[in-house]
Amino acid sequence: MNPSASPLWRIQTVATHAGKAFTCANVRQRAWARWVLGLLLVCLSPTAQAQNELYQDPTLPTNRKITTTARMLGISRAQVLDTYLSPEHYTGPDIRYISQTQREREGRRLSQLITHTGNVAYLKNRAGSGNEIAGMYSFDYALHYGFDWLDHRLQLQVGGRVETHVGFIYNTHNSNNPAQARVFLHLAPSAVASYKFRAGSIPLLLRYEVAVPLLGVMFSPNYGQSYYEIFSEGNYDHNVVHTTIGSAPSLRQMLTVDFPLLRSTVRLGYMGDIQQSRVNGLKTHVYTHGVVIGLVKRFTLIKLAP
């Protein structure tokens, strides 16, 4: 019997030719894929190189807006004295939220610093026989002019800021005149110093911020004057008072360090807020010292100059 005439042999022959054809087709497809991929790489390489040059070439004119935000929580110890409410000192925990936004442009020395602060404190006197609750919202706007040294690692920003404060102190023990309103506006020279360095392989940013009010205006009842007389009877008695560094010596400062943690930047440090005034025969001071911790984010917007 002729093996070439066998049906089984014919099936094997057809399968062999089909396998060879399939293999050849795969080889051709892979060859075409290599050619197409190579062509794409050749076409895209100049474009990618041009884009890299566009964003990395320092000679190209750019106008980048840089925004740095910090959201912090502060836990402090507060001491409050308001002789309109009580001659006693009250102390207790203070919790505050601080939101800071710094806006600047690359290549320019002017920058803006906007700060929102809200805090509340629960206080007791030394005998434990009386309580006070104090709260305050503050909005600060600062305009600074910057200097830098050591290849931009050391920076100093100096200028001034406007501070607005609205708050209260409530004495739970008083039946007559139980609360005191705190409303004032300050003009203060301010400064921010920062230094970039490394601890081993960890990049760190040490930052110090300070402001000292020089001039301002504040609301205050006069000695022995009730709020009923002011607002119900309309008896004005020098209740809007001009202040200076002599009558209202105050200081606000913050010393922090920024460091990377996982994929975030953490800010940790000390916060001190000293507010004092002696007007209309009344003395007030609020001393707050504590720890702040929060997150820092930095955003950069790139706009090509025409």
Regions found by a protein language model. Give the residues of each.
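Residues on the lipid-exposed face of transmembrane beta-strands in outer-membrane beta-barrel proteins
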Residues: 75, 95-105, 139-147, 160, ...
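Short loop/turn motifs that connect adjacent beta-strands in outer-membrane beta-barrel proteins
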Residues: 59-67, 102-113, 146-156, 198-206, ...
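Transmembrane beta-strands of outer-membrane beta-barrel pores
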Residues: 74-81, 118-124, 162-170, 210-218, ...
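Short glycine/proline- and aromatic-enriched beta-strand/turn motifs that initiate or cap beta-hairpins
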Residues: 50-109
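Outer-membrane beta-barrel "beta-signal"
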Residues: 287-306
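Outer-membrane beta-barrel transmembrane domain signature
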Residues: 176-263
